[in-house]
Amino acid sequence: MKTIHITHPHHLIKEEQAKSVMALGYFDGVHLGHQKVIGTAKQIAEEKGLTLAVMTFHPHPSHVLGRDKEPKDLITPLEDKINQIEQLGTEVLYVVKFNEVFASLSPKQFIDQYIIGLNVQHAVAGFDFTYGKYGKGTMKTMPDDLDGKAGCTMVEKLTEQDKKISSSYIRTALQNGDVELANVLLGQPYFIKGIVIHGDKRGRTIGFPTANVGLNNSYIVPPTGVYAVKAEVNGEVYNGVCNIGYKPTFYEKRPEQPSIEVNLFDFNQEVYGAAIKIEWYKRIRSERKFNGIKELTEQIEKDKQEAIRYFSNLRK
């Protein structure tokens, strides 16, 4: 996949861009709804013998336009989003820098410069996609703005539990600890990436060594508690349990940030500094304070057995 980063005004020459069918959207999470949009564009591209292109934007428009209701943390930071869009068969990805100048374009200017001007023959987007200043351009106005110079297709919404599959729906699920629902909406396990860092090394003294994780990006971290997870380290994938929390059994004063600690099953390596990817599967329980090490270790063993049963049933 060819990735082209654009800052407005772009200086790309139309004739040098491949004739394409383009899917447009912010695509945070690259969830099932987004996959339907890109999949629709792919099908049309194959039928017409054209290149499959995707256009996304960075940073999130709400960060630029000051809509505080949007969270700062993303389901998929840009690097992860690019990788997932590539996996869907995209041939060319345009990453447009979203800034105030770009946001001030009229709908017609956006179409002329970023659709027609990039040699797009057919545009595809979800029913709620908007473009141009104040989001005044919609999928209903797009045919008029295209003025016969390109076609367009609107993709209807996908629903789950009678609710539209959306990035905000997934963010809410993750913030509530409902990683199972989030995974259904995403069409794959939610994951975060980080580096194994030094912790207080207490886990190994009680028989449950853990890898402490420092995050690479501003991911949405599920709420405190214990989760069944899979973790990829050094190219190998292991089942495990992850504790997100403040370790109230050991700390009277609550630390500023919760720690992310993973106990991997059948794993006994020193991996400080290694990259780690954690996939979240099920919330086992909330965080609690125990009356000593014995009670804590007994509960950790129960958590481990529950995770083992969960992954055993998952394979059936």
Swiss-Prot record:
EC numbers listed for it are: 2.7.1.26, 2.7.7.2
- Annotated coiled-coil positions are none
* Keywords of this entry: ATP-binding, FAD, Flavoprotein, FMN, Kinase, Multifunctional enzyme, Nucleotide-binding, Nucleotidyltransferase, Transferase
One Gene Ontology MF term? riboflavin kinase activity
Asked if the record carries the keyword Zinc, the reply is no
Reaction(s) catalysed by this chain's protein: riboflavin + ATP = FMN + ADP + H(+); FMN + ATP + H(+) = FAD + diphosphate
GO terms under biological process: FAD biosynthetic process; FMN biosynthetic process; riboflavin biosynthetic process; riboflavin metabolic process
Q: Do you know which CDD domains this protein is assigned to?
A: FAD_synthetase_N (cd02064)
Q: Which pathway, metabolic or otherwise, does it act in? A: Cofactor biosynthesis; FAD biosynthesis; FAD from FMN: step 1/1; Cofactor biosynthesis; FMN biosynthesis; FMN from riboflavin (ATP route): step 1/1
Top-rank taxon of the source lineage equals Bacteria
Extract the InterPro entries matched here.
Cyt_trans-like, FAD_synthase, Riboflavin_kinase, Riboflavin_kinase_bac, Riboflavin_kinase_bac/euk, Riboflavin_kinase_dom_sf, Rossmann-like_a/b/a_fold
Q: Which Pfam families match?
A: FAD_syn, Flavokinase
Which family, according to the similarity comment? Answer: Belongs to the RibF family.
Describe its function.
Catalyzes the phosphorylation of riboflavin to FMN followed by the adenylation of FMN to FAD.
Question: PANTHER family, per this entry?
Answer: RIBOFLAVIN KINASE, RIBOFLAVIN KINASE/FMN ADENYLYLTRANSFERASE
Output this protein's name: Bifunctional riboflavin kinase/FMN adenylyltransferase
Organism, as annotated: Bacillus subtilis (strain 168)
Gene field: ribC
